[in-house]
Swiss-Prot record:
Residues 16-263 form the Protein kinase domain. GO terms for molecular function: ATP binding; hydrolase activity; protein serine kinase activity; protein serine/threonine kinase activity. Belongs to the protein kinase superfamily. BUD32 family. PROSITE patterns: PROTEIN_KINASE_DOM (PS50011), PROTEIN_KINASE_TYR (PS00109). One of its GO terms (biological process) is tRNA processing. This is EKC/KEOPS complex subunit BUD32. Component of the EKC/KEOPS complex composed of at least BUD32, CGI121, GON7, KAE1 and PCC1; the whole complex dimerizes. It catalyses: L-seryl-[protein] + ATP = O-phospho-L-seryl-[protein] + ADP + H(+); L-threonyl-[protein] + ATP = O-phospho-L-threonyl-[protein] + ADP + H(+). It is found in: Cytoplasm; Nucleus; Chromosome, Telomere. ATP binds at I22, S23, Q24, G25, A26, E27, A28, V29, V30, K54. InterPro entries: Kinase-like_dom_sf, Prot_kinase_dom, Tyr_kinase_AS.
Length: 263
């Protein structure tokens, strides 16, 4: 991560808020901080509480006016989407804490933890690697079904993620189980199109195949089992929507295979 990005976020924040960078993508940099963005100075919300700061730095290759407009639009769009998703009963997404669209900043609650024995952070990808010695256990099965239910809830309410990889599904411990949370809605949208929902499912399927190929067929079947259960709970109309969506998902999958063959 460049010193320039670190300096730019330091100029935006006040009071020398401590930040630890954890990831950097094409559009944004993600930090953790023990300091709440708008509680009184030097006060934290719990001794071990962490927060997420997602920061969209300035893009030097864009005209400054265009860059500021895009940053404001995308930051506001993601924040509004998260706020709406939080209203859906049963859907697990991070709580929005604060938004500064003019500087490209979104503050969120921190979710997840370090997995035991050095298996890394508790996203779905690392969780499946951690359980590779017992890939078909009840714990893995139930977790994958719950992942499917979360995606089903999102799609039933006509929201799409846009980048549904195993790294963008965080697992939070709930007793002996793990509850999946969908994160990073930078490419998220409101959409009634089965094409957009089919692409979400295809992206996740490919992500699972690419990192857990030996067990991917079973994992993806469990995801679809949970996904289907959400639509089935809405009766005949829900089942009809599910069939339309899966039909399009299979078309998206076929197109993806053709592209892979052609290169």
């Amino acid at each position: 991560m460049s010193a320039e990005i670190i300096a730019s976020i330091a100029d935006v924040l006040t009071d020398n808020i401590p930040l630890t960078p954890i990831s950097q993508g094409a559009e944004a940099v993600v930090f953790t901080s023990p300091v709440h963005p708008y509680l009184p100075k030097n006060r934290t919300d719990g001794d071990d509480k962490l927060y997420i700061l997602k920061y969209r730095p300035e893009k030097k290759y864009r005209h400054p006016v265009i860059d500021k407009t895009l940053t404001k639009h995308r930051t506001l769009g993601e924040s509004r989407l998260l706020a709406k998703l939080r209203l859906i009963d049963g859907l697990n997404v991070p709580k929005l804490i604060g938004c500064d669209p003019y500087h490209g900043c979104i503050w969120l609650e921190f979710l997840g933890e370090d997995l035991p024995n050095g298996h890394g952070f508790s996203n779905l990808k690392n969780f499946l690697w951690m359980n590779a010695s017992d890939p078909y256990s009840d714990l893995v099965r139930d977790t994958m079904i719950n992942v499917g239910k979360q995606i089903g809830l999102m799609h039933w309410n006509d929201y799409c993620h846009g980048d549904l990889t195993t790294s963008n599904i965080v697992l939070v411990r709930a007793g002996e189980d793990w509850q999946p949370y969908l994160i990073d809605f930078g490419l998220g949208s409101i959409s009634t199109l089965v094409e957009d929902k089919g692409v979400d499912l295809y992206v996740l399927e490919r992500a699972i195949i690419s990192t857990h190929s030996s067990f991917a067929n079973r994992y993806n079947l469990w995801v679809l089992e949970g996904f289907k259960s959400v639509f089935e709970s809405h009766g005949k109309a829900g089942l009809g929507k599910y069939k339309d969506l899966i039909r399009r998902f299979e078309e998206v999958r076929l197109r993806g295979r053709k592209r892979s063959m052609i290169g």
